[in-house]
Amino acid sequence: MITQQIPHATTISALRTRVRSWREDRLSVGFVPTMGALHDGHVSLVRLAKAQCDRVVASVFVNPKQFAPGEDLDAYPRTLIDDAEKLTDAKCDLIYLPTPEAMYPDGYSAGVTLKGPALGLESAIRPHFFDGVATVVTKLFNQVRPDMAFFGEKDYQQLLVIRQLVKDLDFPINVLAGETGRDRDGLALSSRNAYLDSDQRTRAGQLNLILKAFAAALSGGASTSDATATALAAASDAFDAVDYVEARCAATLAELGDGPIDRPVRVLAAVRLGSTRLIDNMAANPPA
């Protein structure tokens, strides 16, 4: 467990006491929810929050509700001491460490389900996932009650799901997005990258190149169907398995027609190397 010298709360009451004191001083509150195993992408979100808000809360909670049986809940990396040091270095004002028992006590029965941007893509592969995300984020928003919440663009579908959640449930929260953090070869930073062996790590960098080419083809006037087929073929050659490679409307994640794009879109992919799943996305704009 982290030391008392690092400001943290493990109970809802302790969290609310600290946040209430900030509110009494008329300080704005930013919130960065995480599942731990923090990397530079998470740290950049905390720094973005610090630039926008007077005080920042970051949570570390591996949410069991968004893992299906057989997924990597037990294997998911847990590096709390290192996480606390990174958050402290980034000037996070409070680390919130709820327990599964506190979040989902005996008899817990509520859940949140969304449609709209939650349909397809990740949901087609992991149908439980966004229900778990929406439920835990709703609880965390009610517990922290921030003015702003910060999410990374790497999980683009999740970002749009959270924005829809805030809109539909009337949360008075501004959701801000941080750019995707990347390694030198363009691989999107992810806690699950730690699962990759050296050969897989080398191969993983191809995802960035495939999506860049996909976005460039669409922006250059290629038809959506042709550009998608080319990107899908490249991903199928590069990776052990492909869950999806698609172009969707950037604002809603609605499916597109077969022709050239006429609006901002997002190209999104999920692939596998061994048992490790990689996701990424990029923006593409219609030809000028």
Curated annotation (Swiss-Prot):
<feature type="binding site">
    <location>
        <begin position="189"/>
        <end position="192"/>
    </location>
    <ligand>
        <name>ATP</name>
    </ligand>
</feature>
<keyword id="KW-0436">Ligase</keyword>
<feature type="binding site">
    <location>
        <position position="181"/>
    </location>
    <ligand>
        <name>ATP</name>
    </ligand>
</feature>
<feature type="active site" description="Proton donor">
    <location>
        <position position="42"/>
    </location>
</feature>
<keyword id="KW-0566">Pantothenate biosynthesis</keyword>
<feature type="binding site">
    <location>
        <position position="158"/>
    </location>
    <ligand>
        <name>(R)-pantoate</name>
    </ligand>
</feature>
<comment type="function">
    <text>Catalyzes the condensation of pantoate with beta-alanine in an ATP-dependent reaction via a pantoyl-adenylate intermediate.</text>
</comment>
<feature type="binding site">
    <location>
        <position position="66"/>
    </location>
    <ligand>
        <name>beta-alanine</name>
    </ligand>
</feature>
<dbReference type="GO" id="GO:0015940">
    <property type="term" value="P:pantothenate biosynthetic process"/>
</dbReference>
<feature type="binding site">
    <location>
        <begin position="35"/>
        <end position="42"/>
    </location>
    <ligand>
        <name>ATP</name>
    </ligand>
</feature>
<dbReference type="GO" id="GO:0005829">
    <property type="term" value="C:cytosol"/>
</dbReference>
<keyword id="KW-0963">Cytoplasm</keyword>
<dbReference type="InterPro" id="IPR004821">
    <property type="entry name" value="Cyt_trans-like"/>
</dbReference>
<dbReference type="InterPro" id="IPR014729">
    <property type="entry name" value="Rossmann-like_a/b/a_fold"/>
</dbReference>
<protein>
    <recommendedName>
        <fullName>Pantothenate synthetase</fullName>
        <ecNumber>6.3.2.1</ecNumber>
    </recommendedName>
</protein>
<comment type="pathway">
    <text>Cofactor biosynthesis; (R)-pantothenate biosynthesis; (R)-pantothenate from (R)-pantoate and beta-alanine: step 1/1.</text>
</comment>
<comment type="similarity">
    <text>Belongs to the pantothenate synthetase family.</text>
</comment>
<keyword id="KW-0067">ATP-binding</keyword>
<comment type="subunit">
    <text>Homodimer.</text>
</comment>
<dbReference type="InterPro" id="IPR003721">
    <property type="entry name" value="Pantoate_ligase"/>
</dbReference>
<dbReference type="Pfam" id="PF02569">
    <property type="entry name" value="Pantoate_ligase"/>
</dbReference>
<dbReference type="GO" id="GO:0004592">
    <property type="term" value="F:pantoate-beta-alanine ligase activity"/>
</dbReference>
<dbReference type="GO" id="GO:0005524">
    <property type="term" value="F:ATP binding"/>
</dbReference>
<feature type="binding site">
    <location>
        <begin position="152"/>
        <end position="155"/>
    </location>
    <ligand>
        <name>ATP</name>
    </ligand>
</feature>
<dbReference type="InterPro" id="IPR042176">
    <property type="entry name" value="Pantoate_ligase_C"/>
</dbReference>
<feature type="binding site">
    <location>
        <position position="66"/>
    </location>
    <ligand>
        <name>(R)-pantoate</name>
    </ligand>
</feature>
<keyword id="KW-0547">Nucleotide-binding</keyword>
